[in-house]
């Protein structure tokens, strides 16, 4: 079986606080992996590590078979799209402008890709409306669109339905299923809401106080 993400004894400490304690998980290619735990259990810390935003204290992880302690890990990380903690969007920009900005950051020609991405996440009719006037669900979908701008194989979502109303939750759920089933994207979802993950996940990891 091919694994998109593997962690082996992964550990993260802050002074005297151990947030991740010898964590070992395996995320198969093509899976929707639900990473379940209460707030403060270490879910976001793991995501920040695999996205390269922080360094582990001990252990290792691999993305598409490339270990984090090799120079090739940067190439593997380019296959990840992520929404960490909150959507990385510019509130004074429209949805289209946000996606264009991400294309510029990535150095990708943007003209042909903006509208397909907007249609994919259901924001094609937002026009000149700025993101600051979007609902929370719309902002979350825009954040996912921005994460998809680099055409990733692996999508990492940190609490994607947190704070959303029932309709917003359904829209995110349907989008995740579409990305996985129609586009073949492996999805890693952290959440403290097991009931919602049960509607999505093909595989699970349960974390408590840094332990699986």
What do the PLM-derived regions correspond to, one by one?
Residues 51:
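Helix-to-loop junction immediately C-terminal to a conserved catalytic motif
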Residues 100, 104, 109-126:
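Conserved ABC ATPase "signature" region
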Residues 170-183:
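Helical segment within the ABC ATPase nucleotide-binding domain
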Residues 38-42:
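Walker A (P-loop) phosphate-binding loop of ABC-type ATPase nucleotide-binding domains
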Residues 155-159:
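Catalytic Walker B motif of ABC-type/P-loop ATPase nucleotide-binding domains
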Residues 59-69, 75-76:
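Conserved ABC transporter NBD signature motif
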């Amino acid at each position: 079986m091919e694994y998109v993400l593997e962690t082996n004894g992964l550990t993260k400490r802050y002074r005297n606080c151990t947030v991740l304690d010898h964590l070992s998980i395996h995320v198969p290619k093509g899976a929707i992996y639900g990473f379940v735990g209460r707030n403060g259990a270490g879910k976001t810390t793991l995501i920040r590590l695999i996205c390269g935003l922080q360094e582990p204290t001990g252990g290792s992880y691999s993305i598409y078979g490339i270990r984090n302690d090799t120079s090739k890990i940067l190439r593997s990380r380019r296959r990840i799209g992520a929404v960490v903690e909150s959507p990385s969007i510019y509130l004074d920009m429209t949805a289209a402008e946000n996606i264009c900005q991400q294309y510029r950051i990535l150095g990708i020609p943007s003209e042909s890709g903006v509208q397909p991405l907007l249609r994919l996440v259901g924001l094609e009719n937002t026009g000149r409306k700025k993101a600051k006037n979007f609902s929370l669900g719309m902002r979350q979908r825009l954040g996912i669109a921005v994460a998809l701008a680099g055409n990733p194989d692996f999508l990492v979502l940190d609490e994607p339905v947190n704070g959303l109303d029932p309709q917003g939750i359904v829209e995110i759920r349907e989008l995740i299923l579409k990305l996985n089933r129609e586009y073949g994207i492996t999805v890693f979802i952290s959440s403290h809401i097991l009931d919602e993950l049960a509607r999505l996940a093909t595989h699970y990891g349960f974390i408590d106080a840094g332990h699986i």
